[in-house]
């Protein structure tokens, strides 16, 4: 008869460190993951305190990494801010992260539009509206969209 080996459950701190070794997490995201794994809230608080103290958990570093990741996906500033807000990263941390990760949002919007629409300018209002909606969904402002879709751009 074969018995399946089940490894002993790791303690909360080790699990947190293991999660953070794979990629940066925000405080809220890490807390959610540890809660889902069934750890007690006092163990989670203790593990998070340890990770913060030792620099393993850093919301600013996490926010900057999220900005780089989303820019790589062709997302605009508004979309990125919304995603960080959903992950409960504080407004001040988000502001600092954007200050430390400067982007040319106008050129990014233009690049995304060129890639998506193959440089083809909309000939009809309906097509233009479709292009605008796409770029809005991606998180670009109206000024950035106008720049990206401008014939002279």
From Swiss-Prot:
One of its GO terms (biological process) is regulation of DNA repair. This is Regulatory protein RecX. It is found in: Cytoplasm. Pfam families: RecX_HTH1 (PF21982), RecX_HTH2 (PF02631), RecX_HTH3 (PF21981). The keyword Cytoplasm applies. It comes from Vibrio vulnificus (strain YJ016). GO terms for cellular component: cytoplasm. Belongs to the RecX family. InterPro entries: RecX_HTH_1st, RecX_HTH_2nd, RecX_HTH_3rd, Regulatory_RecX, WH-like_DNA-bd_sf. It comes from the Bacteria. The gene is recX.
């Amino acid at each position: 008869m074969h018995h399946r080996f089940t490894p002993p459950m790791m303690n909360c701190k080790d699990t947190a460190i293991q999660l953070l070794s794979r990629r940066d997490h925000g405080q809220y995201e890490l807390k959610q993951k540890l809660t889902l794994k069934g750890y007690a809230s006092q163990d989670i608080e203790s593990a998070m305190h340890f990770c913060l103290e030792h620099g393993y958990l850093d919301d600013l570093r996490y926010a900057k990494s999220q900005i780089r990741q989303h820019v790589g996906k062709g997302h605009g500033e508004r979309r990125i801010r919304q995603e960080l807000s959903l992950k409960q990263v504080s407004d001040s941390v988000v502001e600092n992260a954007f200050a430390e990760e400067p982007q040319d949002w106008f050129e990014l919007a233009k690049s995304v539009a060129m890639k998506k629409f193959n440089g083809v300018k909309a000939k009809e209002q309906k097509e233009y509206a479709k292009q605008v909606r796409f770029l809005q969904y991606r998180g670009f402002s109206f000024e950035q969209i106008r720049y990206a879709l401008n014939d002279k751009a």
